[in-house]
Amino acid sequence: MPKVAGVDSSTQSVKIVVRDAQTGELLNSASRPHPDGTEVDPAHWWSALQGVIEDIGGLDDIDAIGIAGQQHGMVVLDEGGDVIRPALLWNDTRSSQAAASLNSEFENIHQLTGSKLVAAFTASKVRWLKDNEPENAARARAITLPHDWLSWKLSGSNSIKDIFTDRSDASGTGYFDSNSNSYIDEILMAALGHNQVHLPRIVAPNEFGFDNGKLRISAGAGDNASGALGVGATLGDLVISLGTSGTAFAISDKQTHDVSGEVAGFADLTGNFLPLACTLNAAKVFDAVTNLLGISFDEFSKLALDADPGAGGITFLPHFDGERTPNKPDAQGNIFGLTHKNFNSANIARAAIEGVICGIAYAADQFEQLGVKTNRILLIGGAARNPAVQQIATEIFGKDVQVPPPGEYVADGAAKQAAWALLKTTNPPLWGSGEFEKVPFSGNKPKVKTRYFDAIRAM
């Protein structure tokens, strides 16, 4: 029985799964935490990865492994492969002005890369490095992403020329063309200030980036692309993830080029594209409201379902931490439309859910405006199991919603990719994440989405 391992190295933790490469049967799993912060020494990731590998009994009986990770993080190495400074993660916003400068210098950057730059992108962080730590920028001889660096460390190589990546993670750098699968040297040169730097080679998803006959490491991927593969998303699917923040992405055969910067034109893991939009406020809003009302999450769901669609006219814009889609970092939350008649806990609970779902729907609506066609909706993430969230999502989107069972989709996607390379099949394995729950659309389509879209645009 060939075995594969898949790793999800996220901002919060590292998780590993071991699966039968042919059937997908889960054989083992482990996880370890990562330190908090937006600036982290990559040595912590490496230590945690070594820990979970030890927890599953090592890699001696593992035929192949794939590593997926948080996107955008800047890991800068010197000529000897040593880390020059702590990695700046995707959620480090000190590079916002650097992003604006590069967007101004390359007015067609969204046509070149599929995305306008924001602070999260690697190119923005590289420019920040040049502007604020010129001595470190001058020493840079390799720029890698978190998953690239971990794959390279796992290989045991000491040469920066051996670092490899895949197109999905590279597409989040801001200096990569996902159509030709090649780096754009002019953007990187403008960001860093010199061209004496090595970038990871791009490896196909069904090939190994490292194979010494004993240890085989697949190309790896960015976390969203790996999650899409892990959950079984296919062309035309819209995936909505409701964690602390919210993410909407679709599988498309055409790259998007959004001049507004609200939609990132990423690549997926298989050769298609992954237009993606984020909202900063999702399940954290539900936590805040349950704490305010002094109720459990289950009680919050029941309370929201007691209210009529539209929450009696209450509009809840849940921008507690600013917002990314639309890009309003200084936005604040607002509740309006309150009257003596509608001001009750049930309407507040429902308005909170409607506000979060409408925020995600606004992000997804940008896909349609860019020509991305979607049909099936997959609802994933911690809040996806909530009955009120499920029902309200069907009403806001006006169609059935599919809810996969809980799982480690990012790690599973990395394991699938490793199995794909190991088994040398034309397509990735078909083993899936289990039976999806279908939440049917009731036919009740309140006008709340229009109200929220108008309020969002007026911010």
Where are each of the predicted segments found?
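Glycine/Thr-rich phosphate-binding loops that ligate phosphate moieties of nucleotide
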Residues: 1-31, 66-104, 135, 252-257, ...
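Gly/Ser/Thr-rich active-site cleft segment
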Residues: 9-11, 109-224, 318
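N-terminal phosphate-binding loop and adjacent alpha-helix
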Residues: 26-61
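Phosphate/pyrophosphate-binding loops at sites that engage ATP/ADP/AMP, CoA/4′-phosphopantetheine
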Residues: 49-63, 132-137, 185-195, 363-375
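Short glycine-rich phosphate-binding loop at a beta-alpha junction
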Residues: 61-69, 118, 142, 216-218, ...
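Short acidic, glycine/serine/threonine-rich loops at helix termini
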Residues: 76-79, 154-158, 163, 212-213, ...
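Active-site phosphate/pyrophosphate- and oxyanion-stabilizing loops and adjacent acidic/basic residues
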Residues: 127, 148, 264, 287, ...
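ATP-dependent carbohydrate kinase catalytic cores
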Residues: 171-273, 310, 343, 388, ...
